[in-house]
Amino acid sequence: GCRDLRDLRLQLAQASGVGSRFLDPAGLPEQSAFHRQILGDIEATLRQHLSGFNQASFVDAVSLLGKARMIHAFGMGGPSSLCSDELQVRLVRLGYPIAASHDPVMMRVTAATLGPEQVLIVCSLTGLTPELLDVVKLARSYDAPIIAITLADSPLAELADVLLPLQPAETSFIYKPTAARYGMLLAIDLLATELALALPDDNQERLRRIKLALDDYRGGPDSLPLGD
């Protein structure tokens, strides 16, 4: 409750300051223009993230993953869940044992079984989700190495052994999906490529076998992507 009229005004002012871009969003662009605006935001996000990534962090991540007996990818919410699945798709093609999980109970069960020989990769656009932070702390208590793809300076980033940092990418145009998820996808693509190039001959053979298995199964032109 409010103590008096002054307190009421103060609380109303504080409430209006939270999510103000949703109370007074930017004007609607012309329909022919917002397509270009979305593309422009994606391009800007990719350039921003590429310039913010550190090659040494990817080298450290490759070193951890190369020694892992098992890799687990955790993510909650929309883009973060999808990106943890994307990690599984990318890494399994290279022969890495990996499983993705989004359910908070299953993540907790998994975290309790981890140790120094397993690696946990955690995807989060915010680095703030309480359930995700809890399971990462649990995994750390058993000395499991943590790779985080998340906002720099977030609580999740502070828990990571290796950080692949994301950067804020929100605009005042609230009606489109966040462009930040493209930064996470870029991090995953860079990591997967670094892993592939770490053992190029072995991975060439794995990819050849996948291509052969898919061509026998579905056919199609040689230029089709692997694994779709």
Model-identified regions with their sequence ranges:
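Glycine-rich phosphate-binding loops that contact phosphosugars or nucleotide phosphates
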Residues: 66-186, 192-198
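Short acidic/histidine-centered micro-motifs embedded in hydrophobic/aromatic stretches
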Residues: 11, 64, 210-213
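Internal, active-site/partner-interface "lid" segment
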Residues: 197-228
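Hydrophobic/basic alpha-helical segments enriched in Actinobacteria
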Residues: 12, 31-34, 158-163, 214-217
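HTH-adjacent hinge/linker in prokaryotic transcriptional regulators
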Residues: 1-57
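Electropositive phosphate-/nucleotide-binding environments in soluble metabolic enzymes
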Residues: 2, 36, 40-43, 52-55, ...
